Amino acid sequence: MSAFSEAALEKKLSELSNSQQSVQTLSLWLIHHRKHSRPIVTVWERELRKAKPNRKLTFLYLANDVIQNSKRKGPEFTKDFAPVIVEAFKHVSSETDESCKKHLGRVLSIWEERSVYENDVLEQLKQALYGDKKPRKRTYEQIKVDENENCSSLGSPSEPPQTLDLVRALQDLENAASGDAAVHQRIASLPVEVQEVSLLDKITDKESGERLSKMVEDACMLLADYNGRLAAEIDDRKQLTRMLADFLRCQKEALAEKEHKLEEYKRKLARVSLVRKELRSRIQSLPDLSRLPNVTGSHMHLPFAGDIYSED
């Protein structure tokens, strides 16, 4: 990966698009350079405020991706984003429309669900986003309809995916978390003591308690890491599903167009074949001049009219 500099980050942020691939690519670059987390967050906040309103939400998507996916590597980004994230939410919320606030609300819901930040930060984010109004609780049916609408809007880009992009997406899933046999074995081998609260009664001394605490901590880290990888894989598979749907739609449109062209050229072929057949028929009925006597340069004279009509 390229070396980190504030100028390089500014350039990458200026080129950031709303596509999942663009966000994830820059997110990976930032996580790779996580030792520069403080200047990264500073540049991110500065460029966020300079960005056009229709690009501000993408900056929050980037922060979300970095914060969630860097947790496995270390707490740097979660900690360094904390002092600025509330004001960032407030800024984006005030500069954009209700649709954007709806997307911000989804990000906030995920952070609540996954306990990305402490409750006091989450409450400040809610205040920044909703003000004194509490977010309205939605029914299960409303949530499903909302998800379907969101999936449809993301699944109908103006341009279908390139074949190479589709192949790469499929190849990436060959090494997906669900196929990691080694981790499966480690999870399957977790001792029952770390999974059953009822067995805590068997702890009789501090040493055994600390030993079990270490085992539980390791199990939590293993499962949290694997759950994060599975969540990322689910997102990748959803994206691949959309890509395949777009690719299939494009291929169906191309198929219909080519079938129409084929019928058109079949009709042209039929017309040309008919002309050829008729031409051959007419050629057969014409006299063959090559079979006439060659009179050029011969001493043979054509008869005179008087010779033809002379009386005997």
Swiss-Prot record:
Q: Which CDD domains match?
A: CID_RPRD1A
Q: Does the keyword Phosphoprotein apply?
A: yes
What SUPFAM superfamilies does this protein map onto?
ENTH/VHS domain
Q: Does the keyword Coiled coil apply?
A: yes
Q: What is the effect of changing residue 106 to A?
A: Partial loss of binding to POLR2A CTD phosphorylated at 'Ser-2' in the heptad repeats in vitro
Q: Name one GO molecular function term.
A: RNA polymerase II C-terminal domain binding
On the tree of life, the source organism's domain of life is: Eukaryota
* Keywords linked to the UniProt accession: Acetylation, Coiled coil, Nucleus, Phosphoprotein
Q: Which GO terms describe its biological process?
A: mRNA 3'-end processing; RNA polymerase II promoter clearance
List every position bearing N-acetylserine: 2
Which cysteines are disulphide-bonded?
Answer: none
Record's subunit section: May form a heterodimer with RPRD1B. Associates with the RNA polymerase II subunit POLR2A (via CTD phosphorylated at 'Ser-2' and 'Ser-7' of the heptad repeats).
Q: What does this protein do?
A: Interacts with phosphorylated C-terminal heptapeptide repeat domain (CTD) of the largest RNA polymerase II subunit POLR2A, and participates in dephosphorylation of the CTD by RPAP2. May act as a negative regulator of cyclin-D1 (CCND1) and cyclin-E (CCNE1) in the cell cycle.
What protein family does this chain belong to? Belongs to the UPF0400 (RTT103) family.
Q: Give the matching PANTHER family.
A: CYCLIN-DEPENDENT KINASE INHIBITOR-RELATED PROTEIN (PTHR12460), REGULATION OF NUCLEAR PRE-MRNA DOMAIN-CONTAINING PROTEIN 1A (PTHR12460:SF2)
* Name under which the protein is recorded: Regulation of nuclear pre-mRNA domain-containing protein 1A
Give me the gene this protein comes from: RPRD1A
